């Protein structure tokens, strides 16, 4: 009996895979537990269509990430912050502040979770930031924290 796996099954296969199993194993265990369904020709075609749509979506997202990376490459983002004596900030500048500055000043909307800082920025100066936009697409840019003069 051929079944289409609806979830990953240890020792059998991954979600979406068509596998051949014993009749009893399929009918008495996999199908009732919602782990698989019978592989009909219509279902196999539908899975192929879904896989193709998923691949197109991933490629589209990768192309968007490459476009954003090109915009970020070599960019210096200036962020004003209140600082005390010696250039120490009152508070810190984090991913959230950098993402907000990118959206406001450069019209680049990037999820703050995709921005990596070695540590929170707690002083004035220039700091490198790594943006992991998509698997295989990452770019480093600079953040310059300046005193806002108040």
UniProtKB/Swiss-Prot annotation:
- Asked if the record carries the keyword rRNA-binding, the reply is yes
Q: Which GO terms describe its molecular function?
A: rRNA binding; structural constituent of ribosome
State the Gene Ontology BP annotations: translation
Q: Return any one Pfam family short name.
A: Ribosomal_L9_C
One GO cellular component term of this record is: ribonucleoprotein complex
Record-linked Gene3D superfamilies: Ribosomal protein L9, C-terminal domain, Ribosomal protein L9, N-terminal domain
Q: Which PROSITE patterns match?
A: RIBOSOMAL_L9
PANTHER family documented for this protein? 50S RIBOSOMAL PROTEIN L9
Instruction: Please describe what this protein does.
Output: Binds to the 23S rRNA.
Family designation: Belongs to the bacterial ribosomal protein bL9 family.
This chain's protein is named Large ribosomal subunit protein bL9
Its gene name is: rplI
